[in-house]
Amino acid sequence: MDLLLTNARLVTLQSGEMGYQPSTPMSIGIKAGKIHYLGIDTALAATKQIDLKGKLVTPGLIDCHTHLVYAGNRSNEFEMRLQGVPYQEIARQGGGILSTVYATRQASEAQLLEQTLPRLDGLLASGVTSVEVKSGYGLTLVDEIKMLRVAKSLSQHRLVKVTPTLLAAHALPPEFTGRANDYIEFICQEIIPLVAEEQLATSVDVFCESIGFDLAQTERVYACAVEHGLRIKGHTEQLSNLGGTALTARYQGLSADHIEFLDPAGVEALARSSTVATLLPGAFYFLRETQLPPIELLRQFGVPMAIASDVNPGTSPFCDLTLMMNMACTLFRLTPEEALRGVTQNAAQALGYAESRGQIKTGYEADLAIWQIEHPADLSYQVGTQRLFARVVDGQFEQHKECCDE
């Protein structure tokens, strides 16, 4: 073994009720970055052995929807919204996404990296071991590529697995005002082929919304992405019901995200597919929305629900995934178990890693979060204390720098 962790109380999240209940003290043997052994043996030969002294171990948390890479600051919009100006009106006035686009275009890769790392550090401190990062604030070929390169480079600066997603269809850039179809063709003819060729992203996302792109434009991007061997994700049904979730499910998309205005037909479409419903409570909270996602209907149809931070400067400036777990429980009435599965097992499925991450299971990647807590429900219950002891990413152990337990 390369690493043996002993006296660990495991929350494996394997199928069944017992996957959520902490185990009696066990050992985890890690070899070549994967979980090789789960059992009670504490004397296995290992290059490195660490006694966890009864600490709780969960799968590493997975943030499956973020906009981490951007430049600029939009706290002024926060003040505007508190004065009653709706998000849609801010966007129509050239604010919103486009204000971040201008700042991001002006920033170099080095400047973007410098501004992104503190946000990433916040997520890592909340137990995140894998993170999805979208483009979408460049909206030109050069700037979208720049964002994806910065996203891919994050794993060179921090111990984390990064999954980049192309979101060129995030907003209509000013150069294409009044020509949304032309911009969609530009994405399909210029951006997607290059991103696929250079392997800068594994999936393509579209903001399918009344202030974004319509159903036909979304499908044009989806079809092009599939043609180039890329997976599908969608921002759907956040502010209205356009049918984007059902379209995403029809293309066997990895996930449909936001979904506050999802109708029963959309839920049934998800149930017929493998597409995950990703909840973004941070944006719901920050925008003071009132339309709740159809949680009970999703439960009834057995649709897997993921939870993500949606870290972004305009609608969810939160860099703590456990805070999102708390919000999902308090605002959306998820159980703490559903919340934990939402940032592990189901989040892994939302990124295409259902068979390799998101559970503590032999043969899976050794991605773990080690906590100084009594029960997994504590992760959703209490926010703001230093609970993370260490993370393990692809078998590499890293103790949290602010943890006082030696």
Curated annotation (Swiss-Prot):
Fe(3+) binds at H65, H67, H235, D310. N-formimidoyl-L-glutamate binds at Y137, N312, G314. Zn(2+) binds at H65, H67, H235, D310. Keywords: Cytoplasm, Histidine metabolism, Hydrolase, Iron, Metal-binding, Zinc. It is an enzyme of class 3 (hydrolase). Its main location: cytoplasm. Belongs to the metallo-dependent hydrolases superfamily. HutI family. NCBIfam families: hutI. This is Imidazolonepropionase. It comes from Vibrio vulnificus (strain CMCP6).
